[in-house]
């Protein structure tokens, strides 16, 4: 393996970094979920400023191996960062956060990341569709955009039962505070409602009927989606049918009990065993020969152990970088919007080198 390093020209943009944060509070939401709020020291306040829709990555070491998980921020902009966590059976992180973490504990937390960002200055009409723990980014988006006096929000929130609704009291408080500007609709799949339309899963047919009855889609400025793969796919399909432009639909995927989706396109046919891959990060350039059978993120780990990542599943967007030179194959993408892809951005955890030389810039 050959490695070359050099310093690049302009100063790089600020990169997400880990810092030890003290847990301020752990609030029980349901039997299997909590909200964890962090204290941020004065010197890190600016670094941990977040936009509605962004996420925090939590890091811990178990048995000498580093693990990371990304969790959506569920606080209004300007408040202390807070994440919502629902336990996954035998989950390495979720069980720890739900049952073991206490106020006063110190946790390694990365500064906010993510391209799912709502701008409260825009006002407008917003449609939010969430299922289960997909409500977490919606808590930040809804509470933030409604600070604009002209903003309106319709939130369709799917759960199994009323007892499994995360942030039930806070959602009721938001409804009381904003009245007719917030239309809150609970849809339950395992608990009968008085209205049949509100009983069942948020699948395509029910979404069509809900939107026809409640939401003039042609007046929607932005749609925000968060939940499991099936709900996201159905929501995007229905909104497309109803004429909402794709660049107005923003989504975040949660993988819970979902089979891996099919590749979005066939794998590229490559020749040769390796590519010379150049990594630009924090103003430092590193070039190394890497196998074409490994993702750029995994292949570069041997020479650059400072690369940003979290889920490694093409979902969180933490490993986003711009493909500046060469050809590469991004096999899955559930984090970048089409505009970002058109600008050359890729998820390095899902991108494999194809050409003899490839350059990706994390500072772009």
Where are these regions (language model features)?
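Iron-sulfur (Fe-S) cluster-binding modules
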Residues: 1-15, 20-22, 32, 241, ...
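Ferredoxin-reductase
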Residues: 3-106, 110, 124, 159-162, ...
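Ligand-binding loop in jelly-roll beta-barrel domains
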Residues: 77-80, 120-124, 353-362
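FNR/FR-type flavoprotein reductase catalytic core
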Residues: 95-269, 273-278, 285
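Active-site proximal loops enriched in glycine and acidic residues that flank catalytic Cys/His/Asp
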Residues: 227, 253, 279-281, 290-292, ...
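C-terminal accessory/binding modules appended to enzymatic or scaffolding proteins
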Residues: 272-308, 312
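Iron-sulfur (Fe-S) cluster-binding segments and ferredoxin-like electron-carrier domains
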Residues: 286, 299-308, 317-364
